[in-house]
Amino acid sequence: MGPLLYRSRHIPAEEAQETGCFTTLPIRIHLRDDLADAASRRFVSDWAREMGDGREKKTYFSFSPVGNWSSLIYPEAIPERLGVLAYLSDLGLIHDDTGEGLSIEEAQAEHDELHAALDPDDKSSLDPDSRAMKTKKLVSQCMLECINLDHELGLNMLAAFRDVWLAISEKNSDKEAQTLEEYLQYRSDNGGMLVFWPMLQFSLGISLSEAEHELVQPIIDAATEGLLLANDYFSWERELREVQSGQSKRIVSAVELFARTMGLSVEDAKEAVKSRIIKSESDFCQRRDDLYKAQPNISSKLRRWIDCAGLAVSGNHYWCSACPRQNAWKNDTLSNGQNGHGLYRIHDGNGFKTVPMTNKTATDLQSNDIKILSNGNGGNAILNGNGAKTVVNGNGAKRKLSQYRMASPEQEPFVQKKRSMDTDTSCQKHDIQTVSQYPHHKPSNLAMDAPAAYISGMPSKGVRAALIDALNTWLHVPSAAIKTITSVVNLLHNASLILDDLEDNSPLRRGLPSAHVIFGQAQSINSANFMFVRAVQEVAQSLSPAALTAVLEELEGLYLGQSWDLYWKFNLACPTEAEYVNMIDHKTGGMFRMLLRVMQAESTATETPGLDFERLILLFGRFFQIRDDYMNFGDYAAQKGLCEDLDEGKFSYPIVYCLANHPEYRGHILGVFRQRPTVATTTASPLSTESKAHLVSCLRKCGAFEKTLSCLRDVERELELEIDRLERLTGEANPMLRLCLAKLSTKGIATLG
């Protein structure tokens, strides 16, 4: 194996040791540290402008005398990617700082809102003026840059931010670790490490297979331990002071764990953490060498990945030893803690006490009416002299899973009444009198809501909610109206899904049983119809007459579009491309056009001459549906079922192209379609694997997949140009809209065939 080539600068060990750094691994820094600093300054400026909460004045960011944090943990990053990494890192720092200063309830709300902002499956509406929406704007622009630089790794990083950092940041937050292994597991899950590694991959442009990840995981585990413990070692004094002074409500440290579980003094606990850091670095090197010995022909890609993981450990260690974030406390006066003689001022709930920290054990801390209890993932329960308890954690709040109840309190009387009717013998004697005396009351909505609740709980791409948020950048619809519009769109969309599955005789919806399979056809139809009624009620009660007109007109268009889709399938009549696109404009595009028109009816924005969103929505509807047609034959099949459109006999875009341009395959396709059941009363049965394989082969041979992908790329380019035009007219960039398109981009779609 030849030596690895570097594009970063080596930092001599003696230079690093001047800051108190004791890492045993080599340290390197990116040659373009200026790019990282510029991105950090941009983040601080963007935060101040968008958030306006002054938090940027209270947070120590990635800057340090020895280099930017991102320059040290990503020293080998592709230069064009260093800036966005620094930007995201500073977002993480300020988000953590904000959470540490909140109660557990406030932190949970903060995490839940930001998770919703980044979660395409979330159906809740965001207040345009909320912190989550403002943060979403910051993240959208940055993530758009990431996706444009590397579509696959950029999307992976976005998923890590959303599904790992935010969704499980409170995992096991109520547990107290008793061993270092437990603590490291919790901190690895909750402390951002599962986000860091995708960021490192992105920095290098390295994609790893599952097998490659598994091969190097023991080495990465050692690196993770080194990263976490270095932060604990250098941040202990700062975090302790912040908790004691009331600046923070949580503390994250293995120092406390060792002091509590091993009965060590704080000084000895810090030394134990230091020894463990050195051991983790030794384990990293030993495991790396063992792997190289066992697999001497290991790829240069994996060698580079392992090497850069080690550089991240040493770079983080060096930065922690010198950065103001961890070391500014050293310049504090008595009012901020240490008085210069090893004494600290501690607030016990009744006032300040000055106590020595040297040889202060965890037991001594408890005797001073302050008890710091690690919860296992860096969180703590702070007990003061009054017995008040605040349970806090390292990074935010645990995500809650929605649960459906079989009966609500308002429905319980209905259940009890039925039971009493079953056992009341007096009814048998006085049927006429009892019936005449029953009071009139509204029945329970349990049965009617069940199919709706079921369909709304299914996974979703969340495109409509994202589009509402993005368009509101320009339309400035009040938050109350946005909530109503989001609710109405969700109701109508879910109702259409129930009816679509019935009309298509489809047993599956995104890999799950369709609503009518669970609740029956009649009950599902009734529920879907009521969802339409409820949606119109909400518009009539909460929005303007113009909004109601828009909803009713676009509902008509939805039904018209669906009528032709059903007609073609039942009569085995293939539409022309123009007819098919017109159907899309009404059936699929109608929902997008509806939300636009309703938002325009409620908009408070000043009218701009020439500002017209019609073409944007028209193109978006076509792009969305034709992409869905294409993906049904590809990896999207894992969610919807293998080529489900073929089971339904659907004339999708590839089929329309094939039949219009290659009549030699007409008999093949229509012959198979003719044999499928066309009415919902007939038990649905998917086409055989052999039949599907034959039809896919016909589409591949005639170039239908290439034509469809080419069409998508053309429409995507038109969409990008339309967004450019609208941004020029409004004078306001719309990163959320661009990110919405980027997530659906053809750049990340493989060519079928």
Curated annotation (Swiss-Prot):
Ligand binding (Mg(2+) 2): D96
Q: Which residues bind Mg(2+) 4?
A: D500, D504
**Entry's Gene Ontology BP terms:** alcohol biosynthetic process; isoprenoid biosynthetic process; mycotoxin biosynthetic process
Q: Per the record, which residues fall in region Terpene cyclase?
A: 1-329
Recorded catalytic activity of this chain's protein: isopentenyl diphosphate + (2E,6E)-farnesyl diphosphate = (2E,6E,10E)-geranylgeranyl diphosphate + diphosphate
PROSITE patterns, from UniProt?
POLYPRENYL_SYNTHASE_1 (PS00723), POLYPRENYL_SYNTHASE_2 (PS00444)
State the span of motif (NSE/DTE): 231-239
Report, from the record, the phenotype seen after gene disruption. Leads to complete loss of fusaproliferin production.
Give start-end ranges for motif DDXXD 1.
96-100
Q: Which UniProt keywords apply?
A: Isoprene biosynthesis, Lyase, Magnesium, Metal-binding, Multifunctional enzyme, Repeat, Transferase
* Reported uses of this protein in biotechnology and industry: Fusaproliferin shows cytotoxicity against pancreatic cancer cell lines and provides a new chemical scaffold that can be further developed to obtain more potent synthetic agents against pancreatic cancer. Fusaproliferin and its analogs show also anti-inflammatory activity and can be hit compounds for the treatment of inflammation-associated diseases.
What task does this protein carry out? Answer: Bifunctional terpene synthase; part of the gene cluster that mediates the biosynthesis of the mycotoxin fusaproliferin (FUP) that belongs to the class of bicyclic sesterterpenoids. The FUP biosynthetic pathway starts with the enzyme encoded by FUP1 that combines a C-terminal prenyltransferase domain responsible for the synthesis of geranylgeranyl diphosphate with the N-terminal terpene cyclase domain, to yield preterpestacin I. Preterpestacin I is then decorated by oxygenation steps that are catalyzed by two cytochrome P450 monooxygenases.
On assembly, the entry states:
Hexamer.
- The protein in question is named Bifunctional terpene synthase FUP1
